[in-house]
């Protein structure tokens, strides 16, 4: 019995004991990890609360530069420019006040490298005797003109230091240098040019880039017969034009216009009808004439045989309907 109990205890107790030991070891390691994370969180909170440490928007006073500091930097830059040294020597002398300025105020705030380069570039672009203005909203509109015209310094905020804004030196329509009279004269000149272009296009029947619309031959012939001057002809033609292209408007002449009411055979039919009318007294032979059964064509109003304007000899719906009804009727003898 003793050997059996020992064997059972070893078989069950050893795995259970090892599992408990491993659980205790992992728990201790987890507690150490939690303590380290808590310590890091406390350090981050202290850095955030510290005014001379991490970036915080609650302590804007530490991010603002004083006016005297800006004047000192600008005076150092003037001394560099007045010395007449260019190239690497001027850049080294320009970096010296920036380095001293950075070392002096490193405990207050952190200025990125791109911001220092932008400030140095803007200072070099300014003329001598003008104070520095680092307003981001003014720079976005017209930095150079605002800096030249505003001698008072603007108190720099944290947003102006963190957001890089490049000066736009391109001339603008509504800049402060432009005079109101010059602007009004420019607008009036543009309006006159537009009116001249519009009148030129109207005289040339140039209404855009759409394809030229077709014209009715009958209405064109009536307008030409009733008008004796070129003015009436131009009016009738322009009234029949829907949209003429700019390319086709340059070429004007007495060209034949297509008939809107033409069908596949009506063009040849019209020519055949004209030949028949002219040779009616001398020629007794009948020529084949295509007779329309609709009211599309105005020339053969006497030959209209159907009231439906969509019917002709190819699409005779009434006849087809009668044929269909007759086919449904019972035939005799069946």
Swiss-Prot record:
<comment type="function">
    <text>Plays a role in cell wall integrity. Affects the cell wall polymer composition in the growing region of the cell.</text>
</comment>
<comment type="similarity">
    <text>Belongs to the SKG1 family.</text>
</comment>
<feature type="compositionally biased region" description="Low complexity">
    <location>
        <begin position="218"/>
        <end position="248"/>
    </location>
</feature>
<feature type="topological domain" description="Extracellular">
    <location>
        <begin position="1"/>
        <end position="7"/>
    </location>
</feature>
<keyword id="KW-0472">Membrane</keyword>
<keyword id="KW-1003">Cell membrane</keyword>
<feature type="topological domain" description="Cytoplasmic">
    <location>
        <begin position="29"/>
        <end position="334"/>
    </location>
</feature>
<feature type="region of interest" description="Disordered">
    <location>
        <begin position="76"/>
        <end position="110"/>
    </location>
</feature>
<dbReference type="GO" id="GO:0071555">
    <property type="term" value="P:cell wall organization"/>
</dbReference>
<feature type="region of interest" description="Disordered">
    <location>
        <begin position="204"/>
        <end position="248"/>
    </location>
</feature>
<keyword id="KW-0961">Cell wall biogenesis/degradation</keyword>
<feature type="compositionally biased region" description="Low complexity">
    <location>
        <begin position="81"/>
        <end position="96"/>
    </location>
</feature>
<keyword id="KW-1133">Transmembrane helix</keyword>
<keyword id="KW-0812">Transmembrane</keyword>
<protein>
    <recommendedName>
        <fullName>Suppressor of lethality of KEX2 GAS1 double null mutant protein 1</fullName>
    </recommendedName>
</protein>
<feature type="compositionally biased region" description="Polar residues">
    <location>
        <begin position="204"/>
        <end position="217"/>
    </location>
</feature>
<feature type="transmembrane region" description="Helical; Signal-anchor for type III membrane protein">
    <location>
        <begin position="8"/>
        <end position="28"/>
    </location>
</feature>
<keyword id="KW-0735">Signal-anchor</keyword>
<dbReference type="GO" id="GO:0033101">
    <property type="term" value="C:cellular bud membrane"/>
</dbReference>
